[in-house]
Amino acid sequence: EFMRRIFIATVSLFLLFNAGAQSILQRPKLVVGLMVDQMRWDYLYRYYDRFAPNGGFRRMLNNGFSCENTLIPYTPTYTGCGHSSVYTGSVPAINGIAGNTWWDKEKMRTVYCAEDNTVNTVGSKSSLGKMSPRNMLSSTIGDELKIATNFRSKVVGIAIKDRGGILPAGHSADAAYWYDNTVGDWISSDYYMKELPAWVSEFNSRKMVNRYY
């Protein structure tokens, strides 16, 4: 009888912890990181009435969690620093992105935060694709997600400007895309791929930019 009770108690504990582990291990299938240049957190509340009733901003406010006291003390407040600091959780002195551009005393010239002369443009013949995250010294949320899932996760960065797509996505991103304003197409670099995926090429072929300019 005593052994039977121990067995039942052991099985009960196993089922309890197993159920708890299953609930903890439930993960979202999609995580979206969004940065809006020069948008302070209080704008979400100030302009709440102007957001679409079923739009994304109201959904985030009504169903999300607001970290209003979060602060990363860094300077200068350029976008390269901002993207890197938010997605690495570190400051420029640690992540290496000290501005959109800075003076490199070893190269004796000004360098751009995402420049990389060892890679080539994919998607156009311009030099605007010679970019990568190699100047960034820290890992990003995307990099840590890759490690945590044994590189089964897919991480993609997309932005109008190259630094906005490249730096947040991190070193191990599957892809990063940005806009080439010399040809009106979305491009990448061979740091990520040898050629654009079919869906990007198809989107470029629509020349949607011609509708606005």
For every predicted segment, state its role:
Residues 1-26:
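Bacterial Sec-dependent N-terminal signal peptides
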Residues 26, 38, 47-51, 77, ...:
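Soluble non-cytosolic domains of exported or imported proteins
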Residues 28-40, 60, 86, 145:
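Beta-strand elements within well-structured catalytic alpha/beta cores of enzymes
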Residues 32-43, 121-127:
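Acidic/histidine-rich, surface-exposed loop or edge segments in extracytoplasmic proteins
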Residues 35, 40, 53-57, 82-83, ...:
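Stable alpha-helical elements in mature extracytoplasmic
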Residues 41-45, 79, 165-169:
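Extracytoplasmic/secreted cell-surface and envelope-processing proteins
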Residues 44-94, 154-158:
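Short, structured active-site-proximal loop/turn typified by the sulfatase FGly-forming signature C/S-X-P-X-R
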Residues 91, 96-213:
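His/Asp/Glu-rich, glycine-adjacent segments
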